[in-house]
Amino acid sequence: MNILLLDGGKDFGHSHGELNHTLHKKAKEVLTALGHNVKETVIDAGYDVEAEIEKFLWMDAVIWQMPGWWMHEPWTVKKYIDEVLTAGHGKLYHSDGRHRVNPTEGYGTGGLLQGKKHMLSLTWNAPIEAFTREGDFFEGKGVDAVYMPFHKLNEFIG
C-alpha cells in the first residue's frame, strides 16, 4: 500500500512538537518494515505544493499526525490544507459536486481521489474521558465529533 504520512507537529510556545514528530517517525519505521511504500512531509519544515499534490495522487491512504490545538489542527496544517487542496483543483477534485440541474444536491461529491483512505493520529493534553463522558467538556460526543470537519475535508476530495 502507498501511504502518505503528514507530520503536523509544530514547535510553538510551550509545545515543541516532539511527541508528534516521534509518533510520525515510528509510523514510518513500522509501515516500511511491514512492506508499505511510504512518502512523508513534515509540514513545519516546509513543502512544495505541486509535490504534495503528486503525493496525494500517489497515495492509497494518508495518515495525519498532529496535535489538537484549541480544538483544531495547528494553523500550519490548516495552511497546508488550504494551499495544497486549492492548488489541487482539477487533480484532487473537479468541483464541489453539485450540478446546474439541481444545485441543492450532490455537494461534496466532486472529489477525484475515490477509494483513498485517511486516518487521524492525534495527540491531546486531555484524557479520553473529556471526549467520551457525558457531562464532560466534549459532552460525550467523542474525538471524531470534534474532527468531523477534518473527516469531511478528506471525504470531499475522495
Question: Across the structure, where does each feature detected by a protein language model lie?
Answer:
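N-terminal beta1-alpha1 ligand-phosphate binding loop
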Residues: 1-34
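Hydrophobic/aromatic beta-strand patches that form the interior of the parallel beta-sheet core
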Residues: 4-6, 39-41, 63, 119-121
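Flexible, glycine-rich phosphate/dinucleotide-binding loops
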Residues: 12-13, 47, 127
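Short, solvent-exposed amphipathic alpha-helices that sit
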Residues: 19-29, 141-157
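A short, structured loop/turn motif at beta-sheet edges
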Residues: 32, 113-115, 156-157
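A short beta-strand-loop structural module common to alpha/beta enzyme folds
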Residues: 34-47
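Residue-level detector of anion-binding/catalytic polar loops
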Residues: 37, 62, 158
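Helix-loop-strand module that forms the ligand-binding subsite of alpha/beta enzymes
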Residues: 50-150
